[in-house]
């Protein structure tokens, strides 16, 4: 009978393990900002500006949604204006047909 010597083969890592981290991800972009430009004609209900908080205030014929989104109440031309010294507002002025 043949007797075979079996080698005791053990493999070890030749590099340290990578470990884990609590970083390495990012949130989805929320697509905030101006959705209509100054001088642009919009219809009633059109979104003018998406924001968190009141970065820009609603002016004439502009409403503010529950998430502070500004929208046009009537069809007209968009105007971004100053409100006092340090605030801005957006208004929609109807055009004569």
Curated annotation (Swiss-Prot):
<dbReference type="GO" id="GO:0022625">
    <property type="term" value="C:cytosolic large ribosomal subunit"/>
</dbReference>
<dbReference type="InterPro" id="IPR001684">
    <property type="entry name" value="Ribosomal_bL27"/>
</dbReference>
<dbReference type="GO" id="GO:0003735">
    <property type="term" value="F:structural constituent of ribosome"/>
</dbReference>
<protein>
    <recommendedName>
        <fullName>Large ribosomal subunit protein bL27</fullName>
    </recommendedName>
</protein>
<keyword id="KW-0687">Ribonucleoprotein</keyword>
<feature type="region of interest" description="Disordered">
    <location>
        <begin position="14"/>
        <end position="37"/>
    </location>
</feature>
<dbReference type="InterPro" id="IPR018261">
    <property type="entry name" value="Ribosomal_bL27_CS"/>
</dbReference>
<keyword id="KW-0689">Ribosomal protein</keyword>
<feature type="propeptide">
    <location>
        <begin position="1"/>
        <end position="12"/>
    </location>
</feature>
<dbReference type="Pfam" id="PF01016">
    <property type="entry name" value="Ribosomal_L27"/>
</dbReference>
<comment type="similarity">
    <text>Belongs to the bacterial ribosomal protein bL27 family.</text>
</comment>
<dbReference type="GO" id="GO:0006412">
    <property type="term" value="P:translation"/>
</dbReference>
């Amino acid at each position: 009978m043949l007797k075979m010597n079996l080698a005791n083969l053990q493999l070890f890592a030749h590099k340290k393990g990578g470990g884990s981290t609590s970083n390495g991800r990012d949130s989805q972009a929320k697509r905030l900002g101006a959705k209509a430009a100054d001088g642009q004609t919009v219809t009633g209900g059109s979104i003018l500006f998406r924001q968190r908080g009141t970065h820009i205030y609603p002016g004439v014929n502009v409403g503010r949604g529950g998430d502070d989104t500004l929208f046009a109440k009537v069809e007209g031309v968009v105007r971004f204006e100053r409100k006092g010294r340090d605030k801005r507002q957006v208004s929609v002025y109807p055009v004569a047909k």
